[in-house]
Structures are given as C-alpha cells and as structure tokens.
Amino acid sequence: MNANLELLSDLVHHMKYAKYLPDKNRRETFKETVDRNKQMHQNRYPDLADEIDSAYQFVYEKKVIPSMRSMQFAGTAIDVNPTRMFNCSYLPVVDWLAFSETMFLLLSGAGVGYSVQKHHVDQLPEIRKPIKSRRYLIQDSIEGWADAIKMLMRAYFDGRPLPLFDYRAIREKGARLVISGGKAPGPEPLKKAINQIQSMFDGKKDGDKMTPLECHDMMCIIADAVLAGGIRRSALISLFSISDEGMMKCKTAYDVVEEEILSTHDGVYNIRLSVWRDGQYCKTQDVFLDKDSYQAMQETGKMEWYYFYPERARSNNSIVIARPLITKELFETKWDVIKNSGSGEPGLYFTNSIELGSNPCCEISLNPYQFCNLTSINVSNLESQEDLNERAKVAAFIGTLQASYTDFHYLRNQWKKQTEKEALLGVSLTGIASIDESDFDFAESAKCSVEENVRIAKILGINPAKRVTCIKPEGTGSLVLGTSSGIHAWHNDFYNRRLRVGKNEAIYKYLLENVPEVVEDEVFGDGAVITVPVKAPDRAKIRTEDVEQFLNRIKHFTKTWVQSGHNGGMNTHNVSATVSIRQDDWSRVSTWLWDNQDAFNGLSFLPYDTGTYVQAPFEDIDKTRYEEFSKRVQRINLEDVLEIEDNTNLQGELACSGGECEVY
C-alpha cells in the first residue's frame, strides 16, 4: 500500500471505526481496534486463544478483515447486544412486529432487507383504530425506541389504547453514548417518525388494509429516524412484487396539478404544490426551488418524488423476479422501466423462491428472520495460490467465530432459531480489479473456506454454514484495506478521493494544522472536504472498461468463488455489484442478464456518469497533478489527534448498493 492509500486508510479507520478512549483523549489506532476485536473472541473462547492470535496476524497486516460492525462495536457493545455482530438481516412484512424489529435492527447497526410483496403484506391484519388513549413513557434506549414503534402498531392493528408518547426520559441531543460511542440524537427524530406514521394510520378507515407502498413508506420513515440518530445510512432494501405498479413508480416524478407561489427571494421560489399520479391525488407540499428547477417544472409539468417523500431515499428497491416464472417479454418490460427511470431503480432480484430475501447490498441469500456476518479477503497483494488459500481459511475462521454470537434479545425467537440453523458466513473478496483472476483458482480457495468453517464449527458446537462465500460491495472496508471495492474497477488510473468531515471534529483541526493541503471548505455546506490523490496499480481494471467485461467478471466469480462455497439453500449467495451502463449499452446488458440468469441474484444499475461537479467524491486527475499533490501529502500520526470529548460518527460503512457510494 503506497503512502497515499495508507493515509486514506488511516483517515477512514479513525473517522468511522476507531473507538474513543476517554483516558487518553484520543481514538484508537488500527492496531488497538484489532486488539479489542481479537480480545473479544479470546475472552469468549480462551481455549482457542492461540489460534485466534495466529489468525489475527492476517488482520494486523490487512490481508483479512473481520466484520466492520464487529470492528466498530467489539467489546461491551456486542456483549450487551449481539445483534451488533451481524451485518445482514431479512424479514417479510407479514406481522406488525416487523416494524419495531426493524427499528431495533437498524439502531443496532444491521442492514435490513424486507419484503413488501403483496402476498406478504396481505397477511397483516385490518386496521382497528384505537378508541381509548393512555400515556406512554418512552425509555432512553434502543429497545425503548423500538417499543415506541411497537406500541403505535399495536394501537392501530390490535385496537389497543393509543399511546400518548412522553419523550422526557430520552437524553437531550449531544449527550454522550457510553456503550456504543457517539452522541445521542435527542427525541426529535423519533417524534417526527411517530407523527408521520400516525398520520398515515389516521388517513385510513376501520377495516382498511395497509398497501405494500404504505408499509414500505413506514419502513423508510423508521430508517430516516435512525439516520438522524447517526447510526447508519441507506440501510434498507425493499423487495416487491413484479406486478406492483405503486412500488415500481415510487421513485419517479409526479404530475403537478396545482401550484401556488408563496414567496420569491433572490431567485428562490417557495411554492405550494399539489401532485397526482395516475389520475389520483397524492400530496400537497411546500417546496423551495431555484430558478432552473422552477423552469424545468413549468416545462415538464412534473416534480421529482424526493420533494414529497424524501424518506424513500433510505431504501434501495428491487423487483422480485422468480426465475421459474419470468418470461422474456415481461423481463424486457421491466428493464425498460429501469432504463427510463434515469436513476437505475428499481434493481432486479432474481430468485428461485419468492420467500427468500437478501440484505441491502444483495450479496447474502437469507431466509426470513435470518442474520449473516461478513469477513473480507484482500486479494490485491496475493503472492501465490497458497497465500490465497490461507487467507480464505483465516477469513472463514473469524467468520465462524462471529457466527456463534446468537444470544439475541428483544427479537422474536425465530431469529435465533433460523440464524443458528444455517449459521451463515459471508466470506468476501476485495481488490479484485488489481489482479488477473486467471492466475488463481478461486474454487479451490472457496473449498478451503468451507473446510475451515466445518472444522471450527465442530469445535464451537455450532452448525456448519449452509452458505459461505460471497462478494460484497466493500464500501469503506476497501478504503481501510487500500484496495478497489469488491468486484468493482478502480475509478481511474489517477484520481482524487474525497471524504467529508465536520469542522467540529478534532481530525479536521489536526489536518488543517499539519497537512492543510488535503483540507478545504465544503462548497455547498458548512463542513470540510478531505482530498487524497490515488493511483491505481499498474494494469489494474478501471471503470472505463467495457460493460460486458465487468459482467463476465461477475459471472466468473459467481461460478468459481460463490457457488463453490454453497452447501445448501434454494439460492446461493451473490456477487454484489452496481453496473454503470452507457447510453448505447442498455440493450446489450439486457441480453446478457437474460442469458445469464444463473450468474447473479441481485444487481443494481446506474446510467454511466461522465459528468463532473464541484468536490465530487471521485475526480479524474492526470499523472502530473497526482505527483504534484502527492509530494505535499505525508503520513500523519493520528495518535496526536486529541479529543476532549467523543465526536464519533456511528454511520460507519454505508449499506449501499454498490462500491462507489460510500463517501458521504
């Protein structure tokens, strides 16, 4: 790893995963974070202390990395709430407890996949509006927030008294969170979510049923409250029926039927808009538009969905496509919707059973009420097949340790039962774009992971994993390792990589004093932007590659790595990927997808972005600019960054659909 990537690695670890050490007035070093993670397992399994120590040498050397959730929360936070060990979860919305459990899971830091397929949502009871009411004091905890949602659902689905929520026990905004780290969000995010959901219920009549779109919106509102609480961003995937037009269109523009200009100032319009879809009234909303946006609305008669339902941005949405039932004609119809959306949504989720689901990034195949943990292998600096095999064993060893933390609380019993039954692993690869995959036998290394899982599972007294290998998008984890993201190509031969930072954070002040060249004020905000120049390895794959080359790489690793680690279940795990499609390539991609349905489960799609904008997360630069900038970049000692109080941002690794959306 060169000096620039080392700096980027240090910064991301410090900002996202390092625990605050109050006795030292600083955050952990990478070694201290790994020490804490390793010690957690050694405390639980003292007889394996030596083996654990040997395995973690690969982590210190950044050849393998555990679950980033476990790196973040290792110790008391996981002891208190083992849900924090797991990256991935899935549940169908067949019971109103799904909403409170989702609040609990998201607040615990897990990504949540959920199904609002029609046959699932139809199982919810009819609305029974509450007649009586009673005061309800919300407790200041993850469980307390989840219970507040549970009480609200119980009132409208079970006819119980309507809770009059009392928020006074919730700590004020900015109070320190001792166990998990970071700052308390205060009661406002929860209060806003409860009011929004209650308003939705109040718009229904006794005996009405909730629609899939309404259930989806409630999930997104819950996720919005969690984001405002600083835990995690975009941590949902919503799976919906192929015939559901409401879900299909929920992230498309609305028809404007009435507008009233309330005020104008310096070219900004404050307008009250009423919007319709398919001839039915949807919503009236006050919005602020600049001159260009106002003129565009006048010309098209439409306004984008996010002005009216911004919470829908919290979820990635995917059509559930049953492989045994889909026809080419129906597939092409849905593909045209994705192409014409301009945003690549919804995504596609091919499955052998509509009862199975996935996590937000779609690399894990999950049964209802099931968790999976993740580990990653850095393949960018492999020395030999033996080296790869050894890393595969270590990643499976650590993943199997992680899989044993199933002493869940709060959740229904089926979560523990289903998770223990299949004891899933998600052993991933990252840095693939730096190597020639034909130099290695990934099927052989996948078998090494499977065999090691069987060995250590027997020692721990848990079941061997039904599914072991996957490829996840790798988000900020790849930055910590200094690699390209999962299966994805490097951005370019030379580029600037940007991270945002608050000016109240100690790291900002330290960088400003020691390496001011990498810090600048944020143009469209009150924070700052850190810029680090990056050089892709020689002969690395970069994002200008042909789209079929990328798709065939996905297919290759599905066949060799993922399927070789499959021991059971109707779906294998998956290669998580976002496919960027040039204007002339949509037809080619459609043909490839139809012809290669067995080479993927879920994929996300985006129009290929050739544009530039100020302070973009990735910015192409040439070799001269890279070399000039690099001369001014130096390694820094983050132990010198002193913090009088904990300003940790718990958003950590974002639960996103691809490898290039983790910056902000």
Task: Show which residues each predicted segment covers.
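Extended catalytic cores of very large enzyme megasubunits
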Residues: 1-664
